[in-house]
Design a protein with these regions (language model features):
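Membrane-embedded beta-strands that build the outer-membrane beta-barrel scaffold
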Residues: 1-3, 8-16, 50-58, 66-74, ...
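Gram-negative outer-membrane beta-barrel proteins
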Residues: 5, 18-22, 34-36, 60, ...
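Outer membrane beta-barrel strand-and-loop segments of large Gram-negative receptors
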Residues: 11-58, 155-158
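Outer-membrane beta-barrel and related beta-rich outer-membrane complex signature
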Residues: 22-26, 74-92, 191-215
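Flexible, solvent-exposed coil segments and beta strand-coil junctions
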Residues: 26-37, 143-153, 219-230
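Conserved small-residue
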Residues: 40-46, 50, 57-160
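Residues that define the transmembrane beta-barrel architecture of outer-membrane proteins
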Residues: 46-50, 64, 164-168, 233, ...
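Extracytoplasmic gating/loop element in the C-terminal half of outer-membrane beta-barrel translocons
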Residues: 117, 130, 186-258
Length: 258
């Protein structure tokens, strides 16, 4: 679209994208196969959303001008299937967290679930000794148990994913006589992060570690070991100034150049 004598322009696009041939590692029988697993292109995905772009020459005077441009996108993606008639795969665990403690993985990719889904225990507080409690079977308001005793039956898909739904880029350009200033902002919204720093350095349990102040402040009630649960799942939203450019264009005597 173009409006106001081309001072405002942009576009709005909607999309649905289907992907196929996603690579997976599948178990196969011995024989006839030579190895117990095989890599195959089987998985399918789907994404949908929109992209909005706008450019606006907001101010035009003899000495001063201001223009801005913005791009905003919204996307949701999910894995449709990891299997077909020949190869079957229920899910794939994400990369596990490292030592010390080796608490396991915080993400799982499974049929008909959003890409980037978090999978783990639901936090239910702490016991008298400060050990993390979880909801048994992931049912909030039900029975609780020690997080260290949790098993696969207690894990559920947690709220939010690690993939941003919204992405924003916003550029601004100011000019005054021979000077110009450009500011570029970038942001991502609608996603979660598993705060690994809080899990490893924000708890008091390991003596001698260089800890965050949060170990003795907001996390002071936790005295036991770390457990992958939604207590450490936090909003990842951010908007930051990504780049600043300042320029000066001197007036040159063209006679000198010639």
């Amino acid at each position: 679209y173009t409006l106001f004598e081309s001072r405002l322009s942009g576009s709005l696009d909607f999309f649905i994208r289907d992907g196929k041939d996603v690579i997976g590692d599948y178990k196969v029988p011995l024989p006839p196969y030579l190895h117990e697993s095989i890599v195959a292109n089987v998985g399918t995905t789907t994404s949908k959303g929109f992209e909005f772009q706008a450019n606006w020459d907001a101010v035009r005077t003899e000495d001063f001008s201001y223009s801005t441009n913005v791009m905003l996108s919204y996307t949701t993606s999910k894995l449709k299937s990891f299997s077909n008639e020949k190869y079957q795969l229920g899910f794939i665990e994400g990369e596990g967290f490292p030592s010390p403690g080796n608490p396991g993985s915080a993400q799982r990719l499974q049929d008909d679930t959003p890409i980037g889904s978090f999978y783990g225990f639901r936090y239910a507080g702490v016991d008298d000794a400060g050990n993390i409690l979880i909801w048994k079977g992931g049912e909030i308001g039900g029975d609780t148990k020690l997080g260290s005793d949790g098993d696969e039956k207690d894990k559920v898909y947690l709220d939010g994913t690690g993939v941003p739904k919204w992405e924003l880029s916003w550029g601004n350009t100011f000019t005054y006589k021979n000077f110009d200033l450009s500011l570029f902002f970038r942001g991502r919204f609608g996603y979660k992060v598993m705060n690994q720093y809080e899990m490893y350095y924000g708890l008091q349990v390991v003596a001698g570690d260089n800890k965050l102040s949060s170990a003795y402040e907001e996390n002071a009630h936790i005295k036991g070991p770390k457990v992958i649960c939604d207590y450490f799942l936090q909003n990842g939203n951010y908007l930051r100034l990504d780049n600043i450019t300042v320029g000066w264009t001197p007036k040159l005597n063209t006679k000198w150049i010639s």
